[in-house]
């Protein structure tokens, strides 16, 4: 079976894509699109593929492109690069996060070419194991609370993973759960308090769910991650 020819744009986080493609039995790297930095040129040399600095230079068949360049939120122009590639009729995978306007513009430009924002974290083994466990638990118990704690870099992924664990994000509301009249859990949920102890920023996330039939049985005892630089 002939391998699919993949173009990768960006070699920062893009090196993760390059490694995955190099190890794949289904895909083959056909080139790197970048600004021509020493890093990009070294990678193209080591991987024995062409180095492109302009999308117009690409004149051979490309089955798909991966744009791994920051979008506007990260101070980059990844979405614009994706639009240029889509305009050539090349199916394109865009790294997140991306603003909704950027996504809509890419879809508008795509025509018949496939376009997708990459939610790859849900496919890596630790997350797959977590989602499988969540699915099993949901068959045997009623979920009463969910929490997400993550870095801003992976907030989009975190929301996607949470949605997969909960079975979807089709109905949602931001705000205090206790003030929501649409949920049977009014009065429950998490309360968040931020402050400083000494010179350390702290966040208290307090779960307020109480089982009236067993008030001494909390659904959460303690969790206290302490990131260090």
Regions found by a protein language model. Name each.
Residues 64-86, 120-138, 157-167:
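Hydrophobic, well-ordered secondary-structure segments
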Residues 8-9, 33, 68, 118, ...:
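Short hydrophobic segments within beta-strands
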Residues 143-218:
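Rossmann-like dinucleotide-binding domain that binds NAD(P)(H)
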Residues 93, 98-161:
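A contiguous active-site-proximal alpha/beta segment in oxidoreductase catalytic domains
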Residues 1-47:
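N-terminal Rossmann-like dinucleotide-binding module
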């Amino acid at each position: 079976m002939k391998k699919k020819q993949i173009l990768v744009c960006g070699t920062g986080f893009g090196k993760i894509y390059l490694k995955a493609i190099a190890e794949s039995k289904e895909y083959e790297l056909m080139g790197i699109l970048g600004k021509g930095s020493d890093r990009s040129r070294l990678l193209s040399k080591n991987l024995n593929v062409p180095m492109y600095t302009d999308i117009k230079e690409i004149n051979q068949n490309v089955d798909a492109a991966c744009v791994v360049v920051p979008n506007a939120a990260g101070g980059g122009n990844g979405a614009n690069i994706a639009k240029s590639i889509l305009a050539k009729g090349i199916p394109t995978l865009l790294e997140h996060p991306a603003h909704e306007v950027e996504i809509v513009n890419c879809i508008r430009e795509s025509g018949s070419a496939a376009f997708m924002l990459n939610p790859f974290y849900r496919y890596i083994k630790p997350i797959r194991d977590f989602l499988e466990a969540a699915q099993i638990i949901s068959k045997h118990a009623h979920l009463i609370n969910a929490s997400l704690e993550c870095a801003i870099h992976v907030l989009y992924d975190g929301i996607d993973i949470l949605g997969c664990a909960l079975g979807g994000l089709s109905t949602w509301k931001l705000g205090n759960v206790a003030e929501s009249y649409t949920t049977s859990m009014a009065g429950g949920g998490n309360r968040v308090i931020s402050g400083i102890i000494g010179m350390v920023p702290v966040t208290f996330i307090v779960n307020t769910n109480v089982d009236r039939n067993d008030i001494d049985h909390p659904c959460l005892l303690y969790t206290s991650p302490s990131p260090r630089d």
